[in-house]
Amino acid sequence: MSQTTESPMKKISLEKVVLNMGVGKSGDVIEIASRALEQISGKKPSARNAKETQRDWGVRKGEPIGVAVTIRGDDAKALLKRLLEAKGNTVNGRAFDNFGNYSFGIREHIDIPGVKYEPSIGILGLGISVTLTRPGYGIRTRSKHKASVGKSHIITSQEAKDYLVKEFGVTVA
């Protein structure tokens, strides 16, 4: 029996995709960015508030300065395929952290397949953060007896790159 099988606990899966638009000021631009994110994701985004006052920029603490939406499950996988297609199915190798997460940006949201240009929205850029997970990662977030994930169970950047190549056919540059 020289056949080696991987443990089912080591199987990597997509946990969530977070789309974020930071516009830097409140008002109509927040509504425009919110409509753009809703057009991309099909979900209603939530406003993100400023953590501190920046007098030079005219931003007050608690004022909405960005919008974000979190997508999970099968919708996240379908959306990620569209977002990667907008980037030409390539991801920079430096976009990965030591825990299997990665981020990238899109300069113009109209590059995403299925998104049409609307003059009332204009052209906006956005940031995308992708989180990968394994079975057993729930011990970090449960309410009782929280624990850290063991060192050998953490997703490395190389494992995340391999997952992307295998699941989405992406080239890592």
UniProtKB/Swiss-Prot annotation:
One of its GO terms (molecular function) is structural constituent of ribosome. This is one of the proteins that bind and probably mediate the attachment of the 5S RNA into the large ribosomal subunit, where it forms part of the central protuberance. In the 70S ribosome it contacts protein S13 of the 30S subunit (bridge B1b), connecting the 2 subunits; this bridge is implicated in subunit movement. May contact the P site tRNA; the 5S rRNA and some of its associated proteins might help stabilize positioning of ribosome-bound tRNAs. The lineage of its organism: Archaea, Nitrososphaerota, Nitrososphaeria, Nitrosopumilales, Nitrosopumilaceae. InterPro entries: Ribosomal_uL5 (IPR002132), Ribosomal_uL5_arc (IPR022804), Ribosomal_uL5_C (IPR031309), Ribosomal_uL5_dom_sf (IPR022803), Ribosomal_uL5_N (IPR031310). The gene is rpl5. The keyword Ribosomal protein applies. The keyword Ribosomal protein applies. It comes from Nitrosopumilus maritimus (strain SCM1). This is Large ribosomal subunit protein uL5. Part of the 50S ribosomal subunit; contacts the 5S rRNA and probably tRNA. Forms a bridge to the 30S subunit in the 70S ribosome. Belongs to the universal ribosomal protein uL5 family. GO terms for cellular component: cytosolic large ribosomal subunit. GO terms for biological process: translation. Keywords: Ribonucleoprotein, Ribosomal protein, RNA-binding, rRNA-binding, tRNA-binding.
